Amino acid sequence: MSIEPDISPSPDTPAPIEAKVSPMMEQYHEIKAANPGLLLFYRMGDFYELFFEDAEIAARALGITLTKRGKHKGQDIPMCGVPVERSDDYLHRLIALGHRVAVCEQTEDPAAARARKSVVRRDVVRLITPGTLTEDTLLDARANNYLLAIARARASAGADRIGLAWIDISTAEFIVTECAPAELAATLARINPNEAIVTDALYSDPELGPLLRELPAVTPLTRDVFDSATAERRLCDYFAVATMDGLSAMSRLEATAAAACVTYIDRTQLGKKPPLSPPSREATGSTMAIDPATRANLELTRTLSGERRGSLLDAIDCTVTAAGSRLLAQRLAAPLTDVEQIAQRLDAVAALLPDPGLREALRATLRAAPDMSRALARLSVGRGGPRDLAALRDGLLAADQALAQLGALEVPPKEIQTAMAALRRPSRDLAQEFSRALADDLPLMKRDGGFVREGYHDALDETRKLRDDSRLIVAAMQARYADDCGVKGLKIRHNNVLGYFVEVTAQHGDKLMAPPLNLTFIHRQTLAGQTRFTTAELGEIEAKIANAGDRALGLELEIFERLVALVQAATDDLRAAAHGFAALDVTLALAKLAVDDNYVRPEVDGSLSFAIEGGRHPVVEQALRRDGQPFIANACDLSPGPGQQSGQIWLITGPNMAGKSTFLRQNALIALLAQIGSFVPASRARIGIVDRLFSRVGAADDLARGRSTFMVEMVETAVILNQASERALVILDEIGRGTATFDGLSIAWAAIEHLHESNRCRSLFATHYHELTALSAKLPRLFNATVRVKEWHGDVVFLHEVLPGSADRSYGIQVAKLAGLPPSVITRAKSVLAKLEAQDRGQSARALAEDLPLFAVTARAAAEPSPPSEAERLIEALKALHPDELSPREALDALYALKAKLGKA
């Protein structure tokens, strides 16, 4: 979904202001004109209201009533509104749909506006866009929220390059990289941005524009945001460094994208600069390349229906913290290609396996640790509250506990040592200060007050006492005055005119007006039966009581800002500790997964090996286990070199439902798990680094692009054949279906030869074209495998075992019978199949059509099902007999009945 650019008036900008327009609507027009392309949430009392086209868009998106408020140019003004107290829910829904919102608040008290005889002042206090969120209520705790900037450099020689920078301001992550235009789709699928910013030219580009418009939200911006000449200066200004030497080494194109990111953040945060980590450069080729189709087909983070449940991430996510879940998703999106880094992660998982007590103790500690990264981000942009301070306090206390528990490891592996060092970085003085300062029960918002612990600040305690104990203070003063004056009936009262005053009966009034009491008591009012006085002390107390509530809140807010300043001074250390928690959580989660699901440590090296023994599908295995069923494990060896079951291309035949697709996917997932540093579902695994993973498994129409299922399949196959190197792992399922049989067979045949001779990569190729198995005679690295089935009383039993050899039948009719096709259709299909199999290959299509008048049969079947032949009736009757269940007499009767039917036939 695309969002209107913010560089010129958008279609939803109201028409020029006419002469007779209300002051409120005039103010609205001015604010709206300054924020084109955004939905304006305009504060009106307890509601945010939207007008004109904004109202129409929001009403449709939110399913709320569209009404009207007044007129503009003689036309009703469309209006809708949402309650302020529920606005986060509505904002979340709008942002999820890719909209951007400007929140306009009242910035003065309505009473002050009335005194000025003017409309209440309002200003935009927040620009909310899909890629710049920090609030918990708007974020998915288990997923990163990335803003991505894309810059392109044109080259006359045709070597165009794309610079990318992506930021999650809720966690301060900042990453840059470069890629070729052909690699952009795979890179976008890996980053999975919530919002992308691009130039107008790139957004309109005929080649890349359609790809960009598939993203959840795209915001085109003016060229100055992507000005490479000013990029370095803008980055230096943001990070407050003199030169780029203080930041990571970046190419000019990467710096351009990075500068666009920080410029956009500066605009949307209205000048507030959330602290970001210095840009980290991702080296080209450091992660496994996975194109969008492969990510979707393998259901890495979402199923094909868009659900997290049922995906690979859902199956392996045993983390106990939101930050850990986000980091695991990041690793799954970008498996490593560096053998040493993978080994370090595997070492860390292995180190935690022998001690289940330590694992569970650490997981319990982490479970109590809040999301420090996002608390830190909210505090840094002024949107944090007392609970965010408490989150940092609790995180630091949990860090101490985790470090003490990790002391049980004699020699922690490097990955765990790094996490421990990160947990040690913040000063524990911060946790102690927060423990002293923060109350036990904390409000959500700082404006509610009551979050500073009693005894932390003397002046605050005194002010609170004055606020909370005003009655006791006045009562004590009344008793003292009564004693001093010798007037037992003296009272201190209050009204809105005089405020606090001393009241005595008329007969005692003269006494208070005579020396020496007249020096203390000042006459204010004489009534028929009472005389009223005030005192300087009472005036002071009245002022203190009147202002005590405001003063108490003011003091608390001062304390809050001082504590936030302590946080900002320790931002880098706190961020490091938060990442240490996340890394430790992922390691513990993978250790738990390995133990619970019986995974083994893979051998990952720089070879071209791919040898799996006892491999299993991680998601399917869990689903079967829940139903009390076992998963049938299978071996796979795509390693180069001679071997009985070794070939770099496996050609797999067998019926539908037998498990071919599961076998293909499980081997791809095993490779992926190994390269994120996880143990794998197998009894043994040796995997040479896979640099690109390709999957063409399943397809559907792409109606939006005018592509049929077959066209989608061919496009995906073309990508594989054009891009797969010898280090790639390719899984292909049913290439060539969806067109004429011989066309499809020819395409599949040629694709296998291309994989064998040109790509020379490790491949799994499932097919129903049994003729392809003959290729193994001329392609030395092609190995035939089949999925074992067994026939029983005319039905097929799937054994889900992958063995050497090839299938001679597809068992399609048996599968159709299992699916519940009508018996008449199954019977007719068997008849047609028998005749087809009896045909000579050289027989003409016309002769075949004459022998099998299919259209005539179809026409007749539409009126009434064609009855089975007598021979077919006899066969079905025989199948229905169960000799072991018949008595001798019943068996004899059945035989006579069959003979009688045969005679009639």
From Swiss-Prot:
Positions of the UniProt region annotated as Disordered: 272-292
Alphabetical keyword list: ATP-binding, DNA damage, DNA repair, DNA-binding, Nucleotide-binding
GO molecular function: ATP binding; ATP-dependent DNA damage sensor activity; damaged DNA binding; mismatched DNA binding
SUPFAM superfamilies (UniProt xref): DNA repair protein MutS, domain I (SSF55271), DNA repair protein MutS, domain II (SSF53150), DNA repair protein MutS, domain III (SSF48334), P-loop containing nucleoside triphosphate hydrolases (SSF52540)
Residue numbers binding ATP: 654-661
Keyword ATP-binding appears in the UniProt entry: yes
InterPro entries for the chain: DNA_mismatch_repair_MutS, DNA_mismatch_repair_MutS-lik_N, DNA_mismatch_repair_MutS/MSH, DNA_mismatch_repair_MutS_C, DNA_mismatch_repair_MutS_clamp, DNA_mismatch_repair_MutS_core, DNA_mismatch_repair_MutS_N, DNA_mismatch_repair_MutS_sf
Keyword match Phosphoprotein: no
This protein's GO CC annotations: cytosol
Intrachain S-S bonds: none
One biological process term in Gene Ontology: mismatch repair
Family the UniProt entry places it in: Belongs to the DNA mismatch repair MutS family.
Function: This protein is involved in the repair of mismatches in DNA. It is possible that it carries out the mismatch recognition step. This protein has a weak ATPase activity.
Name of the featured protein: DNA mismatch repair protein MutS
Source species: Rhodopseudomonas palustris (strain BisB18)
Gene name, Swiss-Prot/TrEMBL: mutS
